[in-house]
Amino acid sequence: FSVYKLGSDIDKAVKFNMPSILYMKQGKTNKCVVLRWVVGNDALLIDPREGKNILPVKTFKNMITEGVVFYKNRYKGNSRVLLLQQELKARGLYDYPVTGKAGPRTKQALMKFQEREGLVKTGELDEETAVMLSNTGGAPKLTPE
């Protein structure tokens, strides 16, 4: 697994639609909670000491000092382009042979994916794009249980 640092931007955690670990100011110290789901303006936070709390996002948004999301980064190593092309093809964004070699068609398909997901269109497999691509199938989502 890989770790992506969200900074203090909860909107990014919501965009990724994956449970996140948030560090929040509590007096002079920080506490750690899990952002389990967001529905509308409400979020379920799980605190190891206080248990589950459903709170309006606006009540704790400015208290967040850092956040991280763990994701399975399949796009490392020699076969990263091959896996990327397969994933883009499965999503209907890449209609060409899967070769494992990056080119303008792969870049164009990746830009379509980035645009669809609200990411900056770079055509590069940056970390934010890898997080969004990993958010498939069995990956947990920010939805109520």
Report residues per predicted region:
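Short acidic, glycine/serine/threonine-rich helix-capping segments at coil-helix boundaries
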Residues: 76-80, 89-135, 142
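Solvent-exposed soluble domains appended to multi-pass membrane proteins
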Residues: 58-61, 65-78, 85-91
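Conserved active-site-adjacent core of cysteine acyl-enzyme catalytic domains
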Residues: 1-68
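Glycine-rich phosphate-binding loop of ATP-dependent small-molecule kinases
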Residues: 145
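Alpha-helical context
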Residues: 11-14, 64, 86, 95, ...
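Generic surface-pattern signal
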Residues: 65, 135-138
